[in-house]
Amino acid sequence: MRKIGIFGGTFDPPHYGHLLMANEVLHALQLSEIWFMPNRIPPHKQHEQVTKSEDRLRMLELAIADHPRFHIETIELEREGPSYTYDTIRQLLSMHPDHEFYFIIGADMVEYLPHWYKIAELIQLVTFVGVKRPGFSTETSYPIMEVEVPQFAVSSSMIRDRVRKGQTIRYLVPECVRLYIEERKLYGARKSVNSR
């Protein structure tokens, strides 16, 4: 049985914090692979503007290209409407009955578990992995495995904000992602500022 870590998110854009978290969980739990799973419309972000799926997918492909055990699962991008983890995990289990899935969430999402769609059924299908973050607790009544990860205080929203303000994002995202953002003028990028 293969142990697969599922790392869902908008990845708008993917950054070194995502890669660090995925790599630490991969090794801490001795997983076979990490599958990054970009969502089309996450239920908790239905009213936020999200960058086009094609751009987010391409940035993710670029970001993980050099890691042999990182892969992308596009099942949620292909589904219309909001992406519910319960539906996704059921579909993945039917496609890969020989896999055991570990769903990776940051400590900031642990407190929302009681509000997740069909959470009682979901915890029977998948093992949740809570990654500790400063200022958030991984304490919950639901069974989760905890993983300590070195802190890297960066977020996708902070990166988008820095790009909008014309500030550098070098060393916050892989260089290939930075160049893609610049080339596609995502988040209001201006080449002359972001090249620094």
UniProtKB/Swiss-Prot annotation:
Q: Indicate yes or no for the key word Protein biosynthesis.
A: no
Q: Which reaction does it catalyse?
A: nicotinate beta-D-ribonucleotide + ATP + H(+) = deamido-NAD(+) + diphosphate
What domain of life is recorded for the organism? Bacteria
Q: In which pathway does it act?
A: Cofactor biosynthesis; NAD(+) biosynthesis; deamido-NAD(+) from nicotinate D-ribonucleotide: step 1/1
**What SUPFAM superfamilies does UniProt report for this protein, alphabetically?**
Nucleotidylyl transferase
Q: Does the keyword ATP-binding apply?
A: yes
The record's section on CDD domains has: NMNAT
Query: EC class of this enzyme?
Result: transferase
Functional description taken from the UniProt entry: Catalyzes the reversible adenylation of nicotinate mononucleotide (NaMN) to nicotinic acid adenine dinucleotide (NaAD).
Enzyme Commission designation = 2.7.7.18
Q: Name one GO biological process term.
A: NAD biosynthetic process
Which named protein is this? Probable nicotinate-nucleotide adenylyltransferase
A Gene Ontology molecular function term of the record: nicotinate-nucleotide adenylyltransferase activity
Alphabetically ordered keywords of this record? ATP-binding, NAD, Nucleotide-binding, Nucleotidyltransferase, Pyridine nucleotide biosynthesis, Transferase
Q: Member of which family?
A: Belongs to the NadD family.
Originating organism? Geobacillus sp. (strain WCH70)
User: Entry's InterPro entries?
Assistant: Cyt_trans-like (IPR004821), NadD/NMNAT (IPR005248), Rossmann-like_a/b/a_fold (IPR014729)
PANTHER family referenced in this protein's UniProt entry, alphabetically: NICOTINATE-NUCLEOTIDE ADENYLYLTRANSFERASE-RELATED (PTHR39321), PHOSPHOPANTETHEINE ADENYLYLTRANSFERASE (PTHR39321:SF3)
